[in-house]
Amino acid sequence: VSRGLGDVYKRQDKELIFTETSIGMWNDGRNLEKRLMEDMEETALGTVNNWCKAVIVWNLMLDNERGPNREGGCQTCYGAVDIDRSDYKTITRNSHYYIIGHLSSVVKPGAVRIGSKGYTADGIMYSAFENLDGTEALVLLNNTDGTKNITVNSGERSFTYEVPAKAVASFR
């Protein structure tokens, strides 16, 4: 997904927004561990680290029969959240729910990406942001099989955190 975005970014007169990404039967959409790692790496962090200003996830909510949909539309998609048609109360949270949740919990409207390089030697991928109120946000992914200790430095403040294997963490 994120490959080639740097070339498009060279057109400074164009705003990059990554649109219409989905999960479904074709990409093991119910496998939360696999999808969360891949979607956070490619769809969320991979796009914003390559100059995209936003990511639009399709579909936000579907039912457990992958609907409603229109003729010719995706018949095999899952939503960020799927709701059980038998009671309209039971929900299944899928990977896109969690990528939206991690980013929106710390990155606020109008925020700008700041000083982040993406992958590190320790197998951590991250994006850092500055919100309009001056707070800073960090979303990171440990896509390795081991726990990683990280230290985050921001001016005069710093903290250390132990990131579990195959985990996403958000800080503000």
Task: Tell me the role of every PLM-derived stretch.
Residues 10-11, 21:
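Long, internal scaffold/assembly segments composed of regular secondary structure
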Residues 18-99, 115-116:
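Aromatic/acidic polysaccharide-binding cleft in carbohydrate-active enzymes
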Residues 105, 116-155, 166:
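Carbohydrate-binding surface patches
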Residues 14-16, 100, 148:
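C-terminal structured subdomain/cap of oxidoreductase catalytic cores
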Residues 23-24, 62, 143-146, 168:
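Short, glycine-/Ser/Thr-/acidic-enriched flexible segments
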Residues 1-9:
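Single conserved hydrophobic/aromatic residue that forms the stacking wall/gate
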Residues 12-15, 50-55, 109, 134:
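Loop/turn elements at helix/coil->beta-strand transitions in domains of secreted/extracellular proteins
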Residues 162-172:
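C-terminal beta-strand-rich structural cap/linker in extracellular carbohydrate-active enzymes
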